[in-house]
Structure formats: C-alpha cells, structure tokens
A protein has these predicted regions:
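Noncatalytic, solvent-exposed loop/strand surfaces
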Residues: 1-351
Length: 351
C-alpha cells in the first residue's frame, strides 16, 4: 500500500528528517513542518488512515514518537514546540500535555518505567529568524524581515502563499510589510503556544538547554503534577538524543563531551568528560552486549563499557562520515556511513 502525504515545506534548508514508528497494528508518522504540521496513524496491513492530529500549534520539530506505558496504559508521546504530548494510540486524542519544552525540538524522548526523559536545546524564535535570515548573505541586516528577504533566503522555489498567510500576515501587526521585534514571535509561534525565550532576550541567554523528566499518564495539563525534575545544563545537544538505563541518563554533546545524569534527581553523576573521539555528532548512542556505541561524524565508532564510570573499550575508524544512528537487531550492529551499510556481528551471525 501507499499513502500520499502533503509535501512538507521548510524555510530552513535541513528538509524533512522524520521516520515512521510501528505500534501494534499502526504505522505512526509525525511531520512538523512549516506549513501543515500533523501526526498520522495508518493501519499497518492496509495503509488505511486511522486518525490524524493537525498540530497547527507546532513550529518545525524533528522528534520521533515513543511509546510510554504507565500503569498498564500505553500513550504515544511526542515532543514538540513548547509541549510534551501524550496521545491515545487508538483515537489520536491528546490525553495530556506538559508545557515544558522549547521552540524547536530535534531530540527524541526516552521512556523507562513510565517516566519520560528528554534533553533539549533551542534558541528563541525571533532571534533564530533574524540570525539565520536577516544576517545571511541574502539578508540586508536591518534587524527586520520582509517577504522578499525570506524568499531570497529560501531560493528559487516559490514559498507557498499559505505559509505567509499562516505566519507573516499574522505577525505583521502594524501592517507595514515587515516583521520586527515581538512581531516575529507572533508570526512564527501559535498564539496558544509561546515557547522559548522572547525576542528581548539576547546573547548567551537567547538559547536554553536543560534535561527533564516527566511522569507519564494523566489527563489534561499535567505540567504542575507530573514534571519530576528539570535542570538547566550546558551539556545537552540539539540533535543527539539521550540513552537511559539503570538509573543513568547518558548524553553526548557535539564536540565530543559526555555527561551522565541520575534519573532519580536529574543531577550529574560525574563531571563532564571529553570522549576519546572528539568532533561532530549527529548519531545518538545505542547500547548492546553491555556496551555503548557512539558513532561520530568523522567515521569513528567509539565503544564504551556500559557502566557509571567512563571506560573506553575500542575506537574503530570506518573510513567515512556517519550521520545516522546505528541500529541493533538479531545480535548484529548495523551502521550506515555516507556510502555503505555495514553489518557487524560475531561468531555464526557474522557468516
């Protein structure tokens, strides 16, 4: 079967990066783009649409849905602009939400024993748009934006008029044809979901980052009742998702900095440690056979002992860059490099 989805539109040039997730008889797919953000569920056997949640209160996000079981009830949890949301998998109804997150979420949460853990890093929306578009080569650096400037940043592909109607026209409060200051927040954030720092915050404080734990389950707004802890830290990453096991939340920051937090309190279990492979990281850590595997953008795969203390077991150079997170299945480690897919296993499995 095949289901056609709306063609996603992104002002920034990262493009789509979301993957489908399987849950029982459903295929789940969340696509938070700049035009028609939505969460879809399809029947696995036929492709027939089961439900759809139009996430019009979301900006662009890249977080994937995860299943969280609390007291025998499954919720499909999605992290997005301003909110962590728990969905009823059968109907697509938003069962609960916690207003805890930032503007643009690229990391994916982890659910362990009914608790959802996430690490996030994001700047305020006004500052992002000014810094990225007005200060770009195509911008005029006057501290404000007009439609022509946004179109020049995007390039030759025409921006859908529906995008400008949804954002620019809403934010241009004085109707002077420009977005400036608070108008940027109004344009690119839903009126019921003002997430992240306001345009008045500049410098280092314009970007927030923290680790967070939220108890799953509940109904309605659970912000006050279900947030277990939330701690600011300089050691999160805006792309790499955490690994959680045995009371430890393991983080890797771009540049090769590793921090481990206590899942009960959110406090660091040890000081930040520079990994044996520095440089860029896009892939998230994975665990198998008592080891943690960290794939670096430079092609080195670092192998650590799965323990509270840092112990490096090996470093393997695969010869070309790695962006994708490795996968573990059937006793094998699968790694996608720039031009290859590798299967690494031991014993009979390797044959």
């Amino acid at each position: 079967w095949q289901q056609k989805l709306p063609t996603p539109f992104f002002v920034f040039k990262w493009g789509p990066g979301m993957s489908p997730v399987l849950y029982r008889d459903l295929v789940l797919f969340c696509q938070d783009d700049d035009l028609y953000p939505a969460f879809y569920a399809f029947e696995k056997s036929t492709g027939k649409p089961r439900w759809k949640d139009e996430r019009l209160d979301m900006a662009v996000n890249y977080s994937h849905p995860v299943v969280c079981t609390t007291n025998g009830r499954d919720d499909i949890v999605v992290a997005g602009t301003g909110m962590l949301i728990g969905y009823d998998p059968q109907s697509g109804r938003r069962r609960w939400f916690a207003r805890t997150l930032l503007r643009n979420i690229k990391t994916t949460p982890v659910c362990v024993d009914g608790v959802i853990y996430i690490s996030v890093q994001s700047g305020g929306i006004a500052n992002q748009w000014i810094a990225s578009i007005d200060q770009a080569e195509t911008g005029n650096r006057d501290g404000k934006l007009d439609k022509a400037e946004i179109q020049a940043f995007v390039g030759e592909t025409p921006i859908p008029e529906a995008f400008f109607k949804k954002t620019f026209d809403r934010g241009d409060l004085n109707r002077d044809g420009f977005l400036e200051g608070a108008e940027l927040d109004v344009a690119f954030l839903h009126p019921d979901n003002f997430a992240g720092v306001p345009f008045t915050v500049t410098g280092e404080n314009a970007a927030e980052q923290f680790v967070l734990a939220v108890r799953g389950g509940g109904e309605g707004d659970v912000t006050k009742s279900h947030v277990l802890w939330k701690h600011p830290t300089k050691h999160t990453d805006h792309i790499v998702s955490p690994f959680v096991k045995d009371g430890r939340m393991f983080l890797v920051k771009d540049g090769g900095i590793n921090t481990v937090f206590d899942t009960a309190s959110g406090k660091p279990l040890r000081a930040p440690r520079r990994l044996g492979n520095s440089g860029g990281y896009f892939a998230s850590p994975v665990e198998g056979d008592g080891k943690i595997y960290l794939a670096g953008e430079n092609g080195n795969v670092l192998v650590l002992k799965d323990s509270p203390e840092y112990e490096e077991l090996a470093k393997n150079d695969l010869g070309e860059s790695i962006i994708a997170t490795p996968a573990i299945a059937d006793g094998a480690l699968f790694i996608r490099t720039r031009t290859k897919i590798l299967c690494i296993a031991a014993g009979d499995r390797a044959k």
